A protein has these predicted regions:
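Phosphate-binding loop of NTP-binding sites
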Residues: 107-197
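N-terminal leader/targeting and accessory segments in enzymes
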Residues: 1-111
Length: 197
């Protein structure tokens, strides 16, 4: 999937790795936007050739601080909240990641992740459980009731994600949006009609 296809639902400014804004319709802009994106991540340690890296500000770390590392690892693009200068003197900026500047990298990550996985939530019924207490119990009860009614179910919870017969232990109580979209995609591929979370 090209970078341009992933950015369809997003308001953004396109920049080269020297911090310069580029018109999306210019030759340089078209070259940057035509890049194939092989995968997406917000973990700089996992970013590699052809990938799109989400520079997310966290409580303990800021993904923007890892942009140069991600560029050296061959990332095709970086989603950021401010311009990034990654180019050294004499470097061809077209050999470095495209920089996509947005107001919120969290919102951008959610929209891009949905597009990357083919908008899987549009192909299943979604059930969201909210509240203060009893969410996990209610989630498992809803899943059990609907499965007994013959509905193929997926589940994303604070303990685990369940996709068909596959159980994935949770790394965090709330997965990042790109992980949720990946789970949704796997659920669609596994034939799930509905997901409860």
């Amino acid at each position: 999937m090209t970078l341009q296809e992933l950015l369809t639902d997003l308001e953004y400014e396109l920049q080269t790795a020297d911090g310069q804004a580029v018109s999306k319709d210019s030759e340089r802009g078209r070259k940057l936007l035509s890049r194939e994106i092989s995968d997406i991540t917000n973990d700089s340690r996992k970013a590699g050739a052809g990938m799109l890296f989400f520079a997310i500000r966290g409580a303990n770390s800021d993904g923007h601080d890892y942009a140069a590392q991600v560029a050296e690892q061959g990332a095709a693009a970086i989603l950021a909240e401010h311009p990034l200068v990654l180019a050294r003197d004499g470097q061809d900026v077209l050999q470095l990641p495209a920089v996509i500047c947005v107001k919120s990298t969290r919102l951008g990550m959610a929209l891009i992740s949905s597009a990357f996985y083919g908008h899987p939530s549009r192909r299943m019924k979604m059930i969201g459980i909210t509240g203060t207490k009893g969410k996990t119990t209610t989630t498992y009860l809803v899943r059990s009731i609907l499965e007994r009614a013959g509905i193929d179910m997926g589940l994303i919870g604070t303990i685990e994600a369940i996709i068909g017969d596959k159980v994935i232990p949770a790394k965090n109580t709330t997965p990042e949006s790109y992980m949720i979209q990946e789970y949704f995609h796997e659920m669609v591929e596994a034939g799930c009609d509905c997901v409860v979370m």
